[in-house]
């Protein structure tokens, strides 16, 4: 993520990115390392590229101190983002993960603010849809079982789970709903036809 953040902090790239998001109805998605970059840039949770302090959220080493690669359940906690327009709050999806540094950390005050603002978009959950801290549920030990967050306007979304690693014919012998479609085709298509 360090290379990605260095690239985006270039003034021309930074200005073009902010123009895309603020003036041209653009969307941005970061998955796994991309999520790490979005956090280190400030795009999530703040919606702007800005300097980061020790008090800002971060993604750090999993609590079990090793890489995890498996399937987990995540629940939609907020669908205010155009990226999640095809989902309902409470929907549960099975998502592949593969990371060693996926634990979302921030202050209790900030995580409550994110929840109150509807910026926590997905959480790791058990088979009943309940967020938890057990490693079998929350593979990295993220505070409040956070798997993904978004910017205040929902245009920027970051998540750890690899929704893009799901395709027809995969995971045939594993129960779960895999059809999350994080990219809102409906939103993108509506935008395209309005031009």
Task: Indicate residue ranges for each PLM-predicted region.
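Cysteine-nucleophile active-site neighborhood
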Residues: 1-80
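Short beta-strand segments
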Residues: 30-32, 96-98, 160
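Glycine-rich beta-alpha junction loops
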Residues: 35, 100-102, 163-165
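Short helix/loop capping segments that flank catalytic or ligand/cofactor-binding pockets
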Residues: 38-39, 84-85, 105-106, 158-159, ...
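Catalytic beta-strand/loop cores that center a nucleophilic Ser/Cys/Thr
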Residues: 68-152
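A glycine-centered loop/beta-turn motif at secondary-structure junctions
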Residues: 146-174
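Conserved small/polar residues in nucleotide/adenosyl-binding loops
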Residues: 186-193
